[in-house]
Swiss-Prot record:
Chief location of this protein within or outside the cell: membrane
Binding site for [4Fe-4S] cluster 2: C220, C241, C244, C247
EC numbers, comma separated: 1.8.1.22
GO molecular function, one term: metal ion binding
Cofactor(s) named in the record: [4Fe-4S] cluster; siroheme
Name of the protein this chain belongs to: Sulfite reductase, dissimilatory-type subunit beta
Catalytic activity annotation: [DsrC protein]-trisulfide + NAD(+) + 3 H2O = [DsrC protein]-dithiol + sulfite + NADH + 3 H(+)
InterPro entries, alphabetized: 4Fe4S_Fe-S-bd, 4Fe4S_Fe_S_CS, DsrB, NiRdtase/SiRdtase_haem-b_fer, Nit/Sulf_reduc_fer-like_dom_sf, NO2/SO3_Rdtase_4Fe4S_dom, NO2/SO3_Rdtase_4Fe4S_prot, NO2/SO3_Rdtase_4Fe4S_sf
Keyword field contains Iron: yes
Positions with a binding annotation for siroheme: C182
Temperature profile: Highly thermostable. Inactive towards methylviologen below 55 degrees Celsius.
Length: 366
């Protein structure tokens, strides 16, 4: 039923209506920008207008009370304008330079968020940005690890790299709570991926009551499921199962969780940028770390070892994979203190046609 004068579907607002007036006025007409200090970026327009972007790291999930606190601060210092980045940083827009320090102090006092997450490529001084990650235990139905808890533990340990410019080049860290990879773990400098190591255990009673068996069987990408028509349930071929969780998505009677065997793998060397060389996919360097909530000490230790070994030995502007290619993987494992095992050797080989013929870069002439 349509009610006269009532509109319920507004859709996304036009983005230009939400821009700070200085940004809207100078849209596409910026002269240059510079990093004043970690977390503060000065942008200068061709018209001479200046605006400062002040960045703070925030959790991915925020309460409405915290959001309201940040909005109150935005009303006070940035004309009521703020935005969140794709890496879960909140940014304020300040036109009066004298307000910057007061803004930073008030955010830290009221909500406790650190200022940082920027870099200065001209000087070759880089800070660590926030971690992009998936839902984890709080919402996702197939996670092998938590997301928010691990990100909090890792960033607490790497806090100094967020608030200062101590790194030689850009470094992106990401996390996905299972191999479905809602996060950008396939192409990040350092990536944490949740992995299941045991197949689902069918709950026959739940399958009979809640599941459509043909759809569940068809959802398996490796053909590891077969219908058990006699008992009206599903059988799992353990040898074919790759622990992806697709069956649990279709059927609540196929739980995949295993507190003892679920854990995380660490990957390194991915990147999306085409600067200097083509994009790269991440490689596994730690095949499995157990779940150790609430602070995941072993996982955090490995991530810090990798980051600090790279930071201490890389050249300026040298991404992690570029550093590895220069020194070699053997030297990488020596410097990071990680153990090389047979689990790191990939037994999958893509077809020669696909591997050799398809482009991996957009850097070509028409």
């Amino acid at each position: 039923m349509v009610v006269e004068g009532v509109k319920t579907d507004f859709g996304p607002p036009y983005f230009r209506d939400l821009l700070h007036p200085v940004i809207a006025k100078n849209y596409g007409k910026w002269k240059y920008h510079e990093v004043v200090k970690p977390g503060v970026i000065k942008r200068v327009a061709e018209s001479g207008d200046v605006i400062y972007v002040v960045r703070f790291g925030t959790p991915r999930l925020l309460s409405i009370y915290t959001v309201r606190e940040l909005c109150d601060i935005a009303d006070k210092y940035s004309d009521g304008y703020l935005r969140w980045t794709s890496r879960n940083n909140v940014e304020f827009f300040v036109t009066d330079e004298s307000k910057i320090d007061d803004l930073i102090n008030e955010v830290q006092e009221r909500v406790g968020f650190p200022c940082g997450g920027t870099w200065d490529a001209v000087k070759g001084e880089y800070g660590l940005s926030n971690i992009v990650h998936t839902q984890g235990w709080i919402h996702c139905h197939t996670p092998a690890i938590d997301a928010s808890g691990i990100v909090k533990a890792v960033m607490d340990e790497l806090y100094e790299y967020f608030t200062d410019h101590k790194l030689p080049a850009m470094c992106r860290i990401s996390l996905a709570c299972c191999a479905n990879m809602c996060g950008a773990v396939h192409a990040s400098d350092i990536a944490i991926v949740g992995i299941h190591r045991t197949p689902p255990i069918p709950n026959d009673e739940a399958i009979r009551k809640t599941c459509e068996i043909p759809s569940t069987v068809a959802a398996c990408p490796t053909g590891a499921l077969k219908p058990d028509m006699k008992n009206k349930t599903i059988k799992v071929d353990v040898e074919k199962c790759m622990y992806c969780g697709n069956c649990y998505t279709m059927c609540p009677g196929m739980p995949l969780f295993d507190p003892e065997n679920d854990g995380a793998a660490i990957m390194v060397g991915g990147k999306l940028s085409e600067a200097r060389r083509m994009p790269e996919l991440s490689k596994v360097v730690v095949p499995w770390v157990p779940n150790e909530p609430p602070r995941w000490p072993t996982l955090v230790k490995y991530v810090k070892q990798i980051l600090e070994a790279w930071a201490a030995n890389a050249n300026k502007h040298e991404r992690l994979i570029e550093w590895v290619d220069r020194i070699g993987w053997e030297r990488f494992f020596e410097l990071t203190g990680l153990e090389f095992t047979q689990h790191l050797i990939d037994d999958y080989r893509i077809t020669p046609y696909f591997y050799s013929e398809f482009r991996a870069s957009t850097q070509f002439k028409w």
